[in-house]
Amino acid sequence: MARPVVAIIGRPNVGKSTLVNRLCRSREAIVHDQPGVTRDRTYQDGYWGDREFKVVDTGGLVFDDDSEFLPEIREQAALALDEASVALVIVDGKQGLTAADESIAEFLRQQRCPTLLAVNKCESVEQGLAMAAEFWSLGLGEPYPISAIHGAGTAEVLDQVLTFLPPKDQEGDEEEPIQMSIIGRPNVGKSSLLNAICGEQRAIVSPIRGTTRDTIDTNIVRENRPWRLVDTAGIRRRRSVNYGPEYFGINRSFKAIERSDVCVLVIDALDGVTEQDQRLAGRIEEDGRACVVVVNKWDAVEKDSHTMSATEKELRAKLYFLDWAPMLFTSALTGQRVESIFALAALAVEQHRRRVTTSVVNEVLKEALSWRSPPTTRGGRQGKLYYGTQVASRPPSFTLFVNDPKLFGDTYRRYVERHIREGLGFDGTPLKLFWRGKQQRDAEKELARQQNRRG
């Protein structure tokens, strides 16, 4: 059984994301003075006592205005309540009871989810009790004074949260999910792709650039395997981004790449590969992440029987440093080939984690040398490749022992990597090759001897 869910509900700027960061001991949720920073529902792992649960942060609820994503935010909040064991309702003690709080209370009474009421921004016990008193009128039960910033009162609220969670023995052991991040420029269809994969309105979709500001985690199961899908904020050039919610969202996106098992790089079929797409591809390769390139909006392209192969050739020419990544042409709008993403991503993750024996590595290297000898300098010095071994996975990394790394230029190094791929596979993952010379090995041995003597 999946971990129970605790939904955080309230109007804009009452401190919901600050409380989420407090409960989850992180700074994943974006906190900013500007109201409406959180739009989609975002999930994090929460812990209290011996219990684990999911905390879902929702956008600020507004019921007297239907502009700028507000209806969609309400829909996202309702979906969060449908799956939650309890809703933790946050109000602002400093500002006091408002008509917006009363509208939210009325909305919650129409839901089946139990509620707990927390009065935030109560920085002292005496002050907090006085501030909380007026919120009894909401009819949501006892108001608990808390300070999300300083942590005061949160222990009492969490103790109450645990009383609403199902018994611990109903929760089974969870297999660690494969983490798949959906990466791309603004408005290439990342959120639409996530919704198509999940079969629900998981993320707010809009033609307005920058609709997704935070990273959105979604846990699903495909082919009996758990996946954690991460929809990220669209990444623009840094000089095009003002300091604020979008800036923090982009930083979260880069962090999502770092903690992913596999990245889905989404390209707009109508725009082709842009300079920013190339930068993102370079970041994925640099961070050593497995990758699948998804060309979205394929339904909008006029095509014949040769269009796909011609387009793939054109795209790969600009994404040459991801030549190892599989490419899939999809339409989030129609659902075309969307499910195929999982098969390609699972294969890429498998290859990313794969290890091969030293004997197999050296069989491939021996064959590479037989087809093409290492280069010789004008002075008559020739590179010698003695042997190689895999030293790490995630990504697969190999150390090649040679007489002098300087004798092996980029062209021959690319040849060796290509031959390793042809002989061993590793589709969907970058490879790291480390070239170690005799002088470097001798120096390391001498250092080890000296350290042993001192010991």
UniProtKB/Swiss-Prot annotation:
Entry keyword set: GTP-binding, Nucleotide-binding, Repeat, Ribosome biogenesis
Residues annotated to bind GTP 1: 10-17, 57-61, 120-123
Signal peptide positions on this chain: none
EngA-type G domain residues: 4-169, 178-353
One annotated GO biological process: ribosome biogenesis
Gene3D superfamilies: 3.30.300.20, P-loop containing nucleotide triphosphate hydrolases
Domain KH-like: 354-439
Stored InterPro entries: AAA+_ATPase, G_ENGA, GTP-bd, GTPase_Der, KH_dom-like, KH_dom-like_a/b, P-loop_NTPase, Small_GTP-bd
Residues where GTP 2 binds: 184-191, 231-235, 296-299
Assembly: Associates with the 50S ribosomal subunit.
Function: GTPase that plays an essential role in the late steps of ribosome biogenesis.
Protein name, entry field: GTPase Der
Organism expressing this protein natively: Synechococcus sp. (strain CC9902)
Lineage, top ranks: Bacteria, Bacillati, Cyanobacteriota, Cyanophyceae, Synechococcales
